Regions:
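Surface-exposed, charged secondary-structure patches
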Residues: 84-139
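Short, well-ordered alpha-helical segments enriched in acidic and aromatic residues
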Residues: 55-80
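Acidic/histidine-rich, surface-exposed loop or edge segments in extracytoplasmic proteins
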Residues: 26-29, 74-85
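Bacterial N-terminal signal peptides that target proteins for export
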Residues: 1-10
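A mature extracytoplasmic/lumenal domain signature
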Residues: 64-67, 75-76, 120, 132-136, ...
Length: 169
């Protein structure tokens, strides 16, 4: 291949790389967010965490939009199949576990804590998405871990939890 042809191919590949990189950057989602709201969402996570440590189930329920929010771990296929032996329409989620969790906090004699890692917060106006890895710790030992996903919304100038879903390992 001649030097001119090699240079032309190199230039074409370079230009193609720049164009595809620019396209990829434009394809990234844009968010209408601000630092104050991100900070307030992070404070919501901290309040949630502190309510677990202090075992304040009632206080934790005030962080959610209403008592009917989705608050549930994702079931394995084995758990779904087992539940369908008694309920053919079981959807894999079931009723919210918020009340049960609040009661656990209020009545447990164990030391409880939820630790968050790799927190990512995305906010667009009055809607936010929070993802993180967690460890649920009982008496200073990790009981289970997983990924937790929250949807949050801003209403009456306050950030509230709209849904919480998590995996368990």
């Amino acid at each position: 291949m001649s030097k001119k042809r090699t240079a032309a191919v190199f230039l074409a590949l370079l230009m193609w790389g720049l164009v595809s990189q620019a396209s990829a950057q434009e394809a990234e989602p844009k968010f209408n967010s601000n630092g104050d709201d991100i900070m307030r969402i992070r404070s919501l996570l901290d309040e949630f965490r502190q309510d677990i440590i202090r075992k304040e189930g009632y206080a934790l329920t005030k962080l959610v939009l209403n008592p009917d929010v989705l608050f549930h771990h994702t079931n394995t296929q084995e758990e779904i199949d087992s539940a369908r032996k008694y309920d053919a329409q079981f959807d894999g989620i079931g009723p919210s576990q918020l009340d049960g969790f609040a009661k656990l906090l209020a009545t447990s004699k164990d030391k409880l804590e939820e630790r968050f890692r790799n927190i990512e917060i995305r906010q667009d106006g009055p809607l936010g998405l929070v993802t993180f890895n967690y460890d649920f710790v009982i008496n200073d030992k990790v009981h289970h871990s997983g990924l937790e996903v929250w949807q949050v919304c801003k209403i009456d100038e306050q950030w509230k939890i709209l849904s919480v879903a998590w995996t368990i390992y």
